[in-house]
Amino acid sequence: MASNPPLDLTLTPTKGDGRTLEQWFTTFHLVSVVVDPFTNESAWILDTAARILRDFAGAAVRVNWVVTGTAEDARAFLGPLASEFLTFADPDRSYVSALGLQHLPAFVFLRVDGQVVAVAEGWNASEWREVAEAIADTVVWSRAVIPAPGDPQAYVGTPALV
């Protein structure tokens, strides 16, 4: 079960200085895809997740990756996706732990007040679609098509905390 993270938790982008969640929330909700750069399960979802993040890029949300590794790990794992989207490094998994995530990859929607609105862990198209619908309803945006041709079959993912 996901939990609301503390607003004083610092998220550090791969480029730039870290800021607290409260500072990241000054204008936009956070829509994160959380991945582990050391697992196949997270690699399998990159194309699908990038497509979904692109669908919300123009909405009143801050779309981003959270990579459970260093900034270098994030850039190596995501390649050009690390530059296309805001990317946070979470090498000690403090953000993952604060959210109470059990499996990665995960799709997380946090409102500007820091409340978890919706979470999907592992890859299950219907669960990710529910998160996308919660985002679309909140910001009055078009719904992402999930699943789309080429998306992987459902899988549980890997343990979020190791």
Question: Where do the PLM segments sit?
Answer:
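Conserved redox-active cysteine motifs that mediate thiol-disulfide chemistry
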Residues: 34-48
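Thioredoxin-like thiol-disulfide oxidoreductase module
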Residues: 68-104
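Structural signal for short hydrophobic segments within the conserved structured cores
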Residues: 86, 117-120
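Short internal beta-strands
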Residues: 62-68
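Short pre-active-site segment immediately N-terminal to redox-active cysteine/selenocysteine motifs
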Residues: 28, 35-38, 70
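Non-globular targeting/processing and membrane-anchoring segments
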Residues: 1-30, 44, 54-62, 75-81, ...
